A protein has these predicted regions:
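Short, acidic/polar
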Residues: 4-8, 76-84
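Intrinsically disordered, Lys/Arg-rich low-complexity segments
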Residues: 151-172
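C-terminal accessory regions of radical SAM enzymes
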Residues: 77, 93-95, 99-155
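Hydrophobic, well-ordered secondary-structure elements that form the walls
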Residues: 22, 86, 97
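Conserved SAM/AdoMet-binding glycine-rich loop
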Residues: 1-64, 68-72
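C-terminal non-catalytic interaction/assembly regions of soluble proteins
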Residues: 71, 85, 101-103
Length: 172
């Protein structure tokens, strides 16, 4: 699809209304293999081609990638690598973010509930607690954990234009 054939260019030019949503779902090959998805390099190639077409045709379109956190086999270090690649190297502002939701009859759900890969029998790490899931998802938003962001951002000056009166109403 991302070779020199005209198919992708036709999709971008004539069948995209401004935003093309795609689902690479992760960046790390180890996690993508468990998802049964192709390497992230395919998404990078598609992104390059998309940007070339948009520049050449003077289109102001956006590519919107969708990623999943807390997938079986995905550890915190994988989320940090994802953030480094997607937020740092590719400069995407992520909008499509989802924790894994186990659904019936899927390989991901089998791994989620059993903690193992049914094809190999190998143990697979699964983020189960809310804290583990929160920590993984936090990498989508700035590449650091919320407490690390608080330590590195300056406090904002308070707006003293409005003052609270005795009856809890704001006035100038």
């Amino acid at each position: 699809m991302f070779d020199d054939s005209p198919y992708f260019e036709t999709v971008v030019k004539y069948h995209t209304s401004g935003r093309l949503k795609v689902a690479p779902e992760h960046t790390e090959d180890r996690v993508l293999k468990l998802m049964r998805k192709p390497s992230f390099s395919m998404f990078e190639d598609m992104n390059r081609r998309f940007q070339q077409i948009c520049r050449r045709e003077e289109l102001k379109y956006q590519l919107i990638p969708y990623f999943i956190s807390s997938h079986p086999g995905c550890e915190e270090r994988d989320m940090r690598a994802l953030a480094d690649k997607v937020l740092g190297k590719l400069h995407f502002n992520l909008e499509q973010v989802q924790d894994l939701t186990p659904t019936p009859m899927t390989l991901s759900s089998v791994m989620f509930y059993t903690g193992s890969n049914p094809y190999t029998g190998e143990e697979v790490y699964v983020a189960r607690s809310q804290e583990e899931k929160r920590r993984q998802k936090s990498y989508f938003f700035g590449g650091t954990l919320p407490e690390e962001r608080r330590r590195t951002t300056k406090p904002q000056p308070r707006d003293t234009k409005y003052k609270k009166s005795n009856n809890n109403k704001y006035r100038r």
